[in-house]
Structure formats: C-alpha cells, structure tokens
Regions:
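Noncatalytic alpha-helical scaffold of FAD-dependent oxidoreductases
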Residues: 1-475
Length: 475
C-alpha cells in the first residue's frame, strides 16, 4: 500500500551532511539498498521512501537531530523494530527516518523497587531477560518480542497476551524520557508509583505513535517472578463455551490467570500447516480452542488449572484438553499462537483488524462479523483469534481459496466498513493495541468523539507546531 500525499521536499546534500555530522558517517544511511529495510514492513503492505536514515546512539544526538529538523523544517519518522502493523513507522513522503535501535542500554535495574530503566531501542525480549536475571518479571509479551522495541511498544501502547493480568504497556511505564520536536528533552524518568505533582505528561506520549515526540528511555514496572507457570491447550465447541470457561477460571484462579487466548480452528490449522516445527496439541478436531495460562508465586498452579479443566468437563464446556508437561511443550503451545499472523501469508491476501468489544459481546461479534464478511465476499475465510480475557480479537479475513490477492485487498475498506459497524454498535474500538498509523487514520474522526479529536489536534499543535513529527499518522 503506497500512500501518496504531501510529498516532502528533497534534502540537499548540504543538509544531509549536517545530519550526518550529528551521528557520524557510520550511522547515517543513504544507499538505497541499505535504506530499503527501513522503508517497508515485513508483510509488504506499506512501502515508503527516505533519502536518509539516522541511527543516533544517545538522547543528546536525538535532540540535535530534532533541533536541526525544526530549524530546517524537515519531517522525521521515529522507528523502533519496524514491526508495526498500521504503517505508523513507515516514511510515506520521503521523511528522514530516526531509528532508535542503537539506544539499547539498560540504565538501571532495581529489584527492591521493582523497576527497570532502559532506553527505547532495547528489544522487548532483552528487557524480559534482564528482568529475569534479577528474579523479576517484565510481563509485556508479544509475538514480535524478538524484534520489537520498548519505545515502539510504548508508542503504540502495545497489549499482548499478558494484558489480562498485568494491563497494557501504558500500565507498565512509570516514567519517560522524551525528545520534543524542537529538541528539548523532557526528563520524566520517575520510578515512583505515587507522584501527584501536576499533569501526567507521560501518558501524552504513550500511544501517540511518535507524533508528539521521540521516546528515548522509560522507567518500567517489574513484578515478582512466578514460581510456577502452568499452561493448557483446550478444545471446545464455541466462543460462548470459551466465555464460560473464562468465568470459571477467573473464579477459581483469582489473580493467577495471566493469559486466556481464543483461537478459531482455521487459525490453528494455518499455524500447523505453515509454521516450522508446529504440531497440533490435541489429536481430535475442534471448532474452537483456548490457550490459557496460570502464573503463581505458590506451587499450586497445576492443581488449580486441573480443577478448572475438571469443572469445564463436568459442565460440558471443555471437550478435550492437554496441560503442558514441561517448558518445551509450553513453548510449543505459544509458538503455535505466535505464528498465527505470519501463517496467514501463504494463504494469500489477508485483511486484518485489531478490535475490542466488551468481553461478554465477543461471541456475538464473531458470529455477526463472520456472517457479514462472507455475505460481502463469498468464500472469504474469517480467521479470528486473540485475547478473550480483555475482549481484544484479531479479526483477520483471508481471501477465498484460489482468489486473486490484489482484487481481494482492494476491498479492504468495504470489509472495514462492515466489521467496524458491528464493533461500534457493540460499544467497541477499531484499534485495541496496534495503533492508528495510516491504516485507520481516515476512520478515526468517524468513530472518535469530536471533542476528543479537537483536543488531540490542539495537543499536536502545541507540541509540534510545524508538524514535523511523524506527519500524516494518527491525525
């Protein structure tokens, strides 16, 4: 998907040299072959262009870049791991890309305070590992955790599979360091859980997708590392039964239920067929599956999980289930889940939605959306899966078997209209955790409160009066 709108003025060689002097020749990328990985995302859906990619190694260098960009009115696109799914990290109009990947230092870990301060280019998986080294847990977990960065996670307010128990990225950030459009540095790297000294500026930048400033560091909340983690893969008949199992799990497990993923059979089938080394956890076929996990500081997690599954069997909710016998099997369950998005690619065109509805409405949403999409495009294959525990469903639709991918993807907005109408009628959101970017930018004013949009525009004008920070994204 190429975005044609407001092309940027080409950079002069003299201006490129001034930017290059800030980061050093080694970290200023201009050769087209070297720039290429920064201007396209892994699905090939968005393709941009940029004359220059800057890879600063410090907050001071980021500030110098922003000062020069403001002085010369040069647009910037902040980019972390380039794993975003809505085109927010792509330079669509020839902007300068500011890659944060070299901002990769862990500045401080304080297990007594349960905090970690790290730079925005730290890969999520590294942050998890560093927390584990001091017997702590950083619970944000995503399929892209091996390549996505903390800055990107915060800029999109990522959710992930642990949001049921620990919340989304916003709730894991205690403080931020942010470079503003004019190069000023906001130092709000507080480790405090209680701080009522004025406006909460931190939350302006979380979920703003780099349109208000560039996050360069964050103070993150850590949690005690669980002593026991137990995981089950469950086969059942319907999302309604999954909802009943969720209710049982929440009653029996209290706060130890950390993940509860709903998976359609077609999503599981795609992962098994197209993933590397992935096997179906259950021998029989089932219309729906649940991947659930309990984490506890005590040793009774397995007993609790088995009791939940036993109640599900007694009530006719659970048809079959397997509890992971070891870490390897647990990882295999999660690999199947994590590969679901990538496994849709070999099936042709895929129209993706990241929606949320009230938890109780999930079964009705899936049933109504499936019927509406198939009516619109006969043969289309809905592939719903996601976080039932918080109502966030990745409602993806694969093209009909044997269909033409380009023709199918050309109907993206038609499918959006059908799906979003149902979402909004049920009191939901068109973007649960992936952000707005350019993919949902044009729909945002239609679904967001008008006063909220006005306030967002006012904040953007105040913090970025020249509009140089990730232009054309979100608003």
């Amino acid at each position: 998907m190429n975005i044609v709108q407001n092309p940027a003025t080409p950079l002069s060689p003299e201006l490129i040299a001034r930017f290059r002097a800030i980061v050093g020749d080694k970290y200023a990328v201009t050769e087209p072959a070297d720039v290429a990985p920064y201007v396209s995302e892994e699905r090939g859906l968005f393709h941009g262009h940029s004359p220059l990619v800057l890879r600063p190694g410090s907050t001071t260098e980021v500030a110098a870049i922003c000062k020069l960009a403001t002085r010369e009115r040069i647009a910037l696109v902040p980019q972390g791991g380039n794993t975003g799914l809505v085109g927010g990290q792509t330079p669509h109009h020839g902007e300068v890309v500011v890659s944060t990947r070299r901002l990769d230092k862990i500045r401080d870990i304080d297990p007594a305070s349960n905090t970690m301060t790290c730079e925005s280019g730290v890969v999520l998986q590294i942050a998890q590992q560093k927390a584990a080294e001091v017997d702590r847990l950083f619970p944000l977990s995503l399929g892209a955790e091996g390549s996505c960065t903390i800055g990107g996670n915060l800029s999109t307010n990522a959710g992930g599979t642990g949001a049921l128990a620990f919340g989304v990225a916003r709730e894991m950030a205690l403080g931020l360091e942010v470079v503003l459009a004019d190069g000023r540095i906001l130092n709000a790297l507080s480790k405090l859980k209680k701080d009522n000294t004025g406006y909460d500026l931190r939350n302006l930048f979380i979920g703003a997708e780099g349109t208000l400033g560039i996050i360069t560091a964050a103070s993150l909340r850590l949690f005690p590392k669980p002593r026991a983690i137990e995981t089950a893969f469950v086969g059942l008949k319907s999302p309604a039964d999954a909802l009943k199992l969720l209710s049982i799990s929440q009653s029996e497990a209290a706060g130890s239920l950390t993940s509860f993923e709903l998976l359609a059979d077609i999503a599981v089938d795609f992962s098994v067929r197209h993933g590397i080394g992935i096997r179906a956890p259950l021998t029989g076929r089932h219309p729906w599956f649940v991947l659930m996990e309990l984490s506890s500081s005590r040793d009774d997690a397995r007993t609790t999980l088995e009791a939940i599954l036993g109640l599900g069997l007694e009530q006719g909710i659970v048809d079959d289930a397997v509890v992971a016998a070891n870490l390897s099997q647990r990882q295999a369950f999660w690999k199947l889940r994590d590969e679901m998005s990538a496994a849709q690619k070999p099936e042709g065109g895929s129209i993706k939605h990241d929606i949320s509805v009230p938890v109780a409405a999930v079964p009705a949403f899936i049933a109504e959306a499936n019927a509406a999409v198939v009516k619109l495009i006969p043969g289309a294959r809905p592939v719903p899966f996601g976080h039932l525990g918080d109502g966030n469903i990745h409602y993806n639709v694969s093209q009909p078997v044997g269909g033409n991918a380009s023709d199918f993807l050309a109907r993206w907005h038609e499918v959006n209209a059908v799906v979003f109408e149902i979402v909004l009628r049920m009191g939901g959101s068109i973007s649960a955790e992936h952000g707005i970017g350019v993919l949902k930018r044009d729909e945002l004013p239609e679904v967001k409160d008008k006063v909220a949009i006005e306030l967002m525009r006012s904040i953007k004008t105040l913090l970025d009066p020249l509009g140089i920070m990730n232009p054309g994204k979100v608003l």
